[in-house]
Amino acid sequence: MARPTRRPVVELRRISKLYGGGATLVRALDAVDLVVEHGDYVAVMGASGSGKSTLMNIIGCLDVPSSGRYLLDGVDIRRLDDRQQAAVRNRKIGFIFQSFNLIPRTTAVANVELPLAYAGVRPVERRRRALAALGRVGIAERAGNLPSQLSGGQQQRVAIARAIVTDPVLLLADEPTGALDSRSTADLLALFDGFNADGRTVLVITHEPDVAAHAKRVLRMRDGKIVSDGRVAAPTDRPPQWSGAAARARVAAGKRR
């Protein structure tokens, strides 16, 4: 008996987002079609005003399209009310932003626990999973520290641990390296490479070619449209430092930075 076909993580069908009206009408997105399969690694590039941030907000269920259809892991988002959308967003998407969005007077491990608390996970299980996520990003020894006691790179790792703690189907990152130095940027990209090598779907919004170079697929946007969509080097053609094992080793070696 044939196995059922798995639905894509992201399916956008003629998604448009309009602001204003009449002479002031702005098409932030204009009939965008996009499919992202499980295990893909996609970078979205474009100048300011190209529509990439609006696209991220709709994929992340932070905004609703003016028209079109959006399925997230097979779930038709337009059929959900606000409460249901929030639950799906918390369970299926891990967000990583340029600003780390950590609660200042809350420890690293408690910050990571937050999505699990919203999902109703019991405290003991929350703590176990949060510590495991911090270990996955190489910063378990800082679990009891406040954000003010961590470097920028360490704070970003805490934010990444929080993003993966619910085991989401999609990691969605918006300019994740914007507040990092070059060393922390390299470590963050090594984490993304490792996550994707382990089968996790990653979508990154960026204007930096060096960040996009880590993806398997690069989209370019202009005036609310996807104007190019191309595959890059196959995984077997990539440098060996991009493998999952090598990425984990790199993070482990630099975990005290």
Language-model region placement:
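ABC family nucleotide-binding domain
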Residues: 7-215, 220-221, 226
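ABC-family P-loop ATPase nucleotide-binding domain
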Residues: 1-18, 231-257
